[in-house]
């Protein structure tokens, strides 16, 4: 995997373990959690491309929604005390304003990617209200925007597209 090369170059692989598996396979997720007994889960797995969501809506919903549901089930079954589920700033209703969103702004993803991530937030709220209330299990969501990582060479991605232009940037 090309994206794994950056992970190795930064030597992060010397300080932590990294596992690749299919987010749709609950049994593999559950078996891995039983094996490694993590202190926390940091869930970033996703189909992260807005435009691919239009082209492949079922894959987008399966990966993002069912994948998150599988993580929540594994958290519940294995009683993982702390978990962070990463969603996106795309969950906000895009009203074309020229200012940053706030936590209290209206939600409303209008495409498969955005709405799938909004559904993930609803799932986390439901699990917190139904299954994790009055327990020591804490699951939160965070909304990230324009996440970049090793191997991110996708089309129509802000940061990779900027570097492809090979122009100077003034700040």
Where are the regions that the model predicts?
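N-terminal Rossmann-like NAD(P)+-binding domain of SDR-like oxidoreductases, especially those catalyzing
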Residues: 1-150
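Glycine/proline-rich active-site loop of Rossmann-fold NAD(P)-dependent oxidoreductases
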Residues: 118, 135, 148-161, 168-171
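Generic recognition of well-ordered alpha-helical segments
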Residues: 123-126, 161, 165
């Amino acid at each position: 995997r090309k994206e794994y090369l950056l992970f190795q170059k930064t030597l992060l692989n010397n300080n932590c373990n990294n596992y690749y598996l299919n987010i749709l396979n609950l049994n593999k997720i559950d078996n891995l959690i039983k094996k490694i007994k993590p202190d926390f889960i940091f869930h970033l797995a996703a189909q992260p491309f807005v435009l691919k969501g239009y082209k492949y809506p079922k894959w987008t919903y399966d990966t993002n929604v069912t994948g998150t549901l599988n993580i929540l089930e594994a958290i519940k079954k294995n009683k993982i005390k702390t978990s962070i589920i990463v969603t996106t700033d795309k969950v906000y209703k895009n009203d074309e304003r020229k200012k940053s969103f706030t936590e209290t702004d209206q939600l409303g993803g209008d495409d498969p990617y955005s709405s799938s991530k909004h559904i993930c937030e609803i799932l986390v709220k439901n699990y917190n209200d139904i299954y994790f209330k009055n327990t020591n299990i804490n699951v939160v969501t965070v909304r990230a925007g324009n996440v970049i990582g090793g191997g991110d060479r996708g089309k129509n991605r802000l940061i990779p597209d900027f570097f492809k232009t090979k122009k100077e940037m003034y700040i």
